[in-house]
Amino acid sequence: MQMLFRQRIFSWFDSYDIYAEDGSVLYTVKGQLSWGHCLKIFDADGCEVGTVKERVFTFLPKFELFLGEDYIGCISKEFTPFRPGFTVDCNGWQVQGDFWEWDYQILTAQGLVAATVSKELLQWSDTYCIDVTNPCDALPALMVVLAIDAEKCSRNN
C-alpha cells in the first residue's frame, strides 16, 4: 500500500494531507496549538483516529503515539554526533536509513520491512512517499513518519 504524505503550504500550524495511490484522501493531519508538536490524525470521514504528541521538557525530543485514546508507543531522538538517530518503542519496530533528510525504512522486530519512506525532491512543500507492506501498519507507520518530520522541522527552525 502506498501513501503520499504532503504538507499543506499555507497553514498556520502543521497540516498534512495523506493520499492513497488513486489520489483519494486517506487521512488529514491537523496541528494544534500546544507546548511542543501535537498532531491529530483524522480519517477520510473526519473521525479522529490517532495523535502524535511531543513530550516537552525532555533532554532530546520524544513523541508519544496514540491510536484513538490508546497509547501505542513512542519515538525518541538519540544523541548521535554526526547523523540523527531515533529509537522506536512501538510494535517492536526499528528505523534505519538516511535520517539526514530523506530515505529510511521501518523494520519489524523480525527485521522485515514494515514501511519504506522516501522524500520527493523538487516539491513546493514536504512530500514523502510511504510504501507500507501490510495495510494494517499504515496508521502506525504514518505516525512514525510524522514524528520524524516534526523533529526535523524543529531542528531546522
List each language-model region with its residue ranges.
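Intrinsically disordered, low-complexity proline/glycine-rich segments
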Residues: M1-N157
